[in-house]
Amino acid sequence: MHNLLMNSKVLVFDLDGTLYDGTEHYDYYANLLANEISSDKRNSFLNDYKKIKDYDHALTIGKIYDSENDLIISLDPITLKPIQVFTWEGQLLSKDELPENYIEKINYELPYIPVGDGWWIPLVASYHYGAKDVYHCYDKTKEYMATKEFSIPYIKGLKDALEKVKDTKKIVLLTNSDREDVTRLLKLLNLNELFHLEITDGKKPLETEKHFKNIMNKFNVKPHEIVSIGDNFINEISPALKLGMHGVYITNQTTMQVSDSLLVVKKLEEVFE
């Protein structure tokens, strides 16, 4: 196990995209969303979805999508303050080209959508192409993930590593998923009964800092004794670094380095080698 984790007292894990791997479920979701888009725009949607996954588009994980003005907002990785605004096609807009006080009004509430992880990519792309009222597509994807047709991608070494440190460290799950979904997934992953604390319906990123502070109080630890582990920079990593915690960020953009307190990995299994 990596020293960053070994030297900590509390490990805080996200669920989706962290405790299991793969993108098959995102692709399944995208195909359902494609059916909600008019036939003349469907191929453009699927092409853009592929470009975003291949990092060949203005939209990437860690940015905000303005669904009202169809704009993409780039954030400072530590402060999460807006710094640049792009069109969907990738044109950088000057302040003069934006509505008055536009930057100051950006937040995490609709019409602004933080693109925190892989779930948001197909959804935001579908909004760009006119899809509306598509929550049933997310529900259908979750239902598919509960069937035998879906093979959940396990993280190599995860269960063994957690079992080895369970008696010496506190292991916490902090997720936006609901209790029913969490219980089902943990059972599928054979990770049930490993966590000392499970926080569901977490309302990240709006309540991430509150949860972290509650964890510090509950386990009587200092910020630098906690590691937040996840694939969503906005939800899990930036709030942790802001409070003085450590972070493990799971991303394909492994050249990213914003802090000495942050370990960037392509796959979670790298920290268990």
Predicted segments — roles?
Residues 2-61, 80:
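Active-site neighborhood of HAD-like aspartate-dependent phosphohydrolases
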Residues 2-7, 39, 159-163, 172-273:
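Asp-based, Mg2+/Mn2+-dependent phosphohydrolase catalytic module
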Residues 10, 48-49, 82-90, 97-98, ...:
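Surface-exposed, interaction-prone regions with an acidic/low-complexity signature
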Residues 12, 103, 113-119, 146-172:
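Short, acidic loop-to-helix structural element flanking the phosphoryl-transfer center
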Residues 21, 25, 154, 204-208:
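Phosphate/oxyanion-binding active-site loops and adjacent basic polyanion-contact surfaces
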Residues 26-34, 46, 115, 119-123, ...:
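An amphipathic alpha-helix signature
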Residues 36-50, 130-140, 193-194, 224:
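Short, surface-exposed acidic
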Residues 54-143:
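A metal-dependent, Asp-based hydrolase signature
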